[in-house]
């Protein structure tokens, strides 16, 4: 008898087949050593659209809301029928007695497999392959320790709840507000609160009022000491005058030894954030690069929320550290003795450990990797080396001075042991980036009571700064920490979305036209700000959505009831529809398309705008309208264009070529003259070009 192993992607199936000896390639699967290895192509099965439940749901109407299926139905994803039928046929083979779920080891991977398994009607026993690396040794080790599929039932229920909640909120809220505002407004359970955070930051920036302030700066033996802020420029100038030419006294010198622990390893979110800071990569780009490196066996599983390793990985981690230390530019680090134990914490690892390189980096030619993947792999290597390096130790020095009765402060530091920061500095130099720690250089050896005959004094002007726009780095951090203060400390999941879904959420907002990228910044568009303005708090509250995400995590751990969660979602949707049945006229204007002024009304002097079917005066009581398909134009097989209308308003005439004469069955050119008599309809006259005088001289 044979086991059928189902992976999430063809590339993963190929690696599994190679590692387990299924070397014979057939149509849609590998075979060998008593195994069949096949694959999904992402999600093969998807929730049915609302129109599939009832014909009337194919049209968007308020009266049909809310749409709350008693039981959810599923359909094959378009274009993936062949992949599904291949898996169904393999599951039905009489020599297959066991199915192995080898889809990605996480919530979505579990859902992808289970929906296929359920739709085929297969009832053969299921085992689960759960691995964090695509190395051959990791695959073989995982296959020798397969777990019963039933052990992951709670994870599957969590995935189902997430999918159903997204469907219920997305379908109902999107239809509700699209119908009310006569424009497609995509509303999502997670993406809308994310948009709300962007809009809130944009409002703070818009409303920010900058304030001027001044500082006095003393230059002493090459070091700079700074005063407190002066809000009154006259007071700052007066203080500077009092300090000129007078002695300066060092009133205190404090020295404190400080230590900085090595940074933690990367989880997906911190990797995406740093890749955005250093390389400008979007969250999606980083995830794509990391996934590709994982499938090439160079990186461990990327969709993780842990920043530690388990104790059974200590030996492997030590080997990988020494391999990474041989790679340029890290081979220039001095006296590197890794401390693996600082990265180990079994209690802080749930499904997957932190992201680290694999042993395969020893054999890989990194120069052959695409530049994005190479940068990311070196970034992960750098973090692994930093995390296992020694403490960064320095002496923080603060010196205070008195000059003319005013106090000044100078700060600096003296490095005692560079530790992990040496690796970070070398890597940043390799990238031609500034060191991460640029705070304070070395101060001269000041002593308390030291007197300086005089010092250079300068007044500098400054302004308070508004909040910074979100970048993908800072937005990912905000998403991760949303609702953190309102969820118990012991809660495992906090924030909007998961490490695996946040990149897609940002991309959806950009694609929908609610957010735009300007350099590294993410800026909400006018449509995005208006959407947040009109939506109720249950849809825009990051805290509420973070609580939902927390509940999904509890369901995955078996600590919460899926039915109770879904009842809460259904109740929220029902209340949403019953509360929002109509909107004000001002509300409707929020999403009205912006009209372009094309000229001035010849009757009343008000602006004339282009509409869908006409060019009309903005003052409705005036009544001046130029219809695009006026009979004057259609009888001549023409349509009034924006340029023609602009000419008529500006010059009272427009030249038109190729007008049709029904009588002569031919085209002709003429000038069309605006002949407005003040009636309901506008009249036009034709003026033909004068023919050139001809003749033979008789």
What are these regions (language model features)?
Residues 150, 233-266, 272:
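Metal- or metallocofactor-binding catalytic centers and their adjacent structured scaffolds
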Residues 2-4, 80, 91, 174, ...:
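Basic, low-complexity terminal or inter-domain segments flanking catalytic cores
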